[in-house]
Amino acid sequence: MRTSSLTVGAFLSASLCAAALADGTWEVLAVADGATPAGLPGIDGAVWVPNTWNNPTIGLDGLVSFRGQIAGAGITNTGATANHLVLVKGLPGAWTVLARNNSSVPGDTPAGCIISRTASPNNSIVSANNITDDGGVVLSGFMTGPGITVGTNDTATWFQPASGAPVLLAQGRDICPGTAGAQYPANMSVGSGLRMNSVGQAPFYMALTGGDTNGTINNAALVLIGPGDDQLIMRKGDAAPGLAGFTVTPDSFGSFLNGTKIAFSGKLVGTGITTANDSVYLTNAGLTGGLRIYAREGDAVPGFKGLTFANTSSFSFGQRPIADNGTITFVATLGGTATTLNNSAVMTEQNGVFSILLRKGDAVPGITDSTDPNFAGKVFSSPNSTGNCMTRNGLFAFEGIIMNADGTSIVSPAPATFVGARLANGTLVTICRQSDPVPGLSGWTFNSLNGSTSICANDLGTVVFNASMANTTAGETGSVIMAWDEALGLRILAKASALSTTPFTPTGDATFTGTPCNQISLIGSTGNNGDGGGTGFSSNGWLTLRAADTVSGLYSIARIKVGPNGNACPADVNGDGTVNAADLAGLLAGWGTSSPDLNGDGTVNAADLAALLAAWGACP
C-alpha cells in the first residue's frame, strides 16, 4: 500500500531515527514519492521522480550532492525542451541547483550555451558521482549553443569548487597539452570513478586525433585536467622512465590521484617485450618532477630474496591505493620461490621500499584458531580485488577470502569469506565472518561477504559495509549496513528486507520511507576522490546512502554521522541542538516502534522517555 505524502511529510518533520546510541541519527534529506515537494529554489512545486537518483556523495561539511529527475508544472522530460534533470548540493531548505538541463552551462562557459541532449535528455547531465573532501563537485554533460557541433565539441566537464564560481575543465576537441595540435576526443564527459581533488584536477585517459598524431603510435594520452592549463602525464609512445629503448602505453583504466600524487599502470613496447614482462606501474610519488616505474611484471621484488612479481596477472588496486605520504598499496601475484600456498600478497611501496601487509597462507585471528569447525584451520587466501580500502592513517579494510590450509578452495556452501581490517600497528582483526549471527537480529546470519559489500573506511578508524543476510528458519533474506571500529565494535546502522513473492515479515527499517525499505545502497568502490578520501563516507564520519521501498514506490536519500561520539546528544531527536517539547513529541509519536530508539534496545519505551527527560535543555 502506498504511503501518502502526508505520512512522508510528517516523517520528514521528525526527520530522524536513532541508530546505535554511540553513532549519530539518520536524517532523511530527500524523498521521491511523486508527491512530496523537492524544495528546490526557483523551481516551485517540483517533486522528485521516484527511482531516478544516482548515488549521493558527501563532503567533510556534511553537505550532500546528487543527480535526479523532477516533475511538475512547466517541467518536461522529452525532446529539445527537456528541463527535468538537475544536479543539486546542500541540505533540506538550503539546496543549491548546480546544473539543470535547458539552463545555462556552469559559469556560462562556453558563453551562451545550455545543457541539452535532445536525443537522450535523461543523460544530458552525466552522473559523475564525485565530491572532493572540501565539498567541490564535478559536473559533466552535453550542451548546445554558439559554436557547438553535436558529436564534435558538445561535451564538457566543469568543476564547482566549495566556494566561488564554477570553471570549465575540458571540452571535446580541446588541444592536448604537450602535443603539436593533437585534440581531445569528442566526448569529454566523465562518469563514476573520476578522482577529482580539491583544486579541481583529475587524471583522464583519452584517445587523441589530429595534429601530430601518428597512426596508433601516439594516439592516446593520460592527462591531468584542471582549472587553467591541463598537464600531460604520459602520452602513448613516450619513453619508459629508466628503461632505455622502451616506450609505454598508459592503460585506459586504473589511474589514481591523491592531491598531487599520481599512480597508474601501462604496457611496455619494445624488443624482447612479451605478455610476461610488459606490465609496468608508474608514479610521481617521491619525485620533485617526472615519473618513475616502481614495479614491473616479472621483476624481482626488492627486499624479498627469491620473490618476483609473477607474470600470471597484473597488480590489482583497491579504492584508495596512494596515501598522503606516497605509499602505494596493491595486491600482487608472486612468483619465484612462492608456491600455490603463498603466491599472492597485499603489499606497499614507498620510495623503493616494499612491505608485505598480508600474504596468502597467513593465519587469521578468529578463523585459523576458531573452535567452529567451519573455520578452524582455515587461512587467508586473498582480499577481493576492489573490495579493499587503505585509509590515510594506515587502516586497511577488506573483504577477505579464506582457504583450506593445503591451498584448496573451500567448497560452497561452507563459509569462505569474512570482513577484516589490518590496523596501522599491524594487528589483524576479523570484523565478522560469513555465517556469523548478525548482531542484534535474532535468527539472522551473514551471507557471503565478498564482492557486494561496498566496503569503505575513514580516517577515524571506522569501517562501513553493506552485507547480505538470511534467516533460514523464516525463509527470509535481507541486507544490513554495518559499522565497526575498535571503540564501539560491530553494530547495525540500517537494514532492508529482500523482495519476496511469498508472505514474509518485513525486516527493513521504516526510518527512510515510512514503510519497511527493501533496498539500501552505498556508493561502492567508485566512491573515492582525488584527495585520498571517500565520497560516500567522509574522512570525518559523514555517511550518505539511498534507501527504497520499491513495492510502494518510495525512495529517499539520508545521512548519518558514524563513529565514536557521532551523536553526543541522542535525545535531541530533531537535531536542533536542544532537547525540548518537539523532541518529546517526536518520541511519543514513535512509541512502541523502533524510532527514535534512544538507548538502542530496539523499542521506543519508558527507558527512552526517561533518557530524554534527563537530557532536557541545551545539548552539551
For each feature predicted by the language model, list its residue ranges.
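Sec-dependent, cleavable N-terminal signal peptides
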Residues: 1-23
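Exposed boundary/loop context
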Residues: 2, 193, 319, 570, ...
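Aromatic-enriched hydrophobic runs in primary sequence
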Residues: 4-7, 275, 473, 595, ...
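Conserved "turn/edge" positions that cap or connect secondary-structure elements
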Residues: 21-567
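Cellulosome-associated attachment modules in secreted, modular CAZymes
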Residues: 563-620
